[in-house]
């Protein structure tokens, strides 16, 4: 990246050197994600040959992330990338939106993101995409044969929950993704010797 001494400028020169095959983060397209934090607001385009324009576009979008939950007023203008013609805007936006949502959930402190709030976030996402949400809450874990989740969750005034998000037609192949959404974890008790972990 060439930091020009004057603003506004006509172009930005960016070079990342040779990519290391063992390190995917060294790809020039991934390194492009550093620019939105460095450049002034405006609309930018990719010039020259870009080996993977979709990866470059996603990296730019991920680099433009800002956590704003506790900020008031208008969001600061951010640098925007005009997508190359070969990039599908819906796919690119879907990837970026998904990562931004995950970052927002992670960056929200446990005092504001407990099991109930996490379920609310899941229901909001489900509504937006036509998915169905069911949950198992508190003592219902015993009825559904999840005694350990119930036992651990009893240590909190906020009951634990299992949140199940289902999307897609019944006829589609079934794919299950399992994630562990820990809203707050003190690290637990060291009940086992380190050799048993």
Language model segments and positions:
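N-terminal hydrophobic/helix-forming segments and targeting peptides
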Residues: 1-183, 191-196
């Amino acid at each position: 990246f060439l930091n020009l001494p004057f603003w506004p400028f006509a172009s930005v020169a960016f070079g990342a050197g040779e990519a290391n095959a063992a390190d995917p983060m060294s790809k020039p397209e991934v390194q492009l994600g550093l620019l939105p934090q460095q450049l002034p607001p405006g609309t930018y385009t990719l010039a020259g040959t870009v080996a993977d324009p979709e990866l470059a576009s996603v990296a730019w979008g991920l680099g433009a992330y800002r956590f704003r939950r506790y900020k008031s007023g208008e969001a600061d203008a951010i640098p925007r990338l005009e997508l190359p013609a070969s990039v599908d805007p819906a796919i690119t936006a879907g990837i970026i939106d998904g990562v931004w949502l995950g970052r927002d959930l992670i960056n929200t402190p446990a005092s504001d993101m407990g099991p109930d709030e996490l379920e609310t976030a899941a229901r909001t996402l489900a509504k937006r995409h036509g998915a169905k949400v069911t949950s198992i809450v508190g003592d219902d874990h015993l009825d559904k044969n999840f005694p350990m989740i119930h036992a651990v969750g009893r240590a909190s005034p906020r009951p634990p929950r299992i949140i199940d998000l289902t999307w897609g037609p019944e006829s589609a192949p079934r794919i299950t993704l399992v994630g562990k959404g820990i809203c707050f974890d003190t690290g637990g008790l060291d009940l086992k010797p380190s050799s048993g972990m």
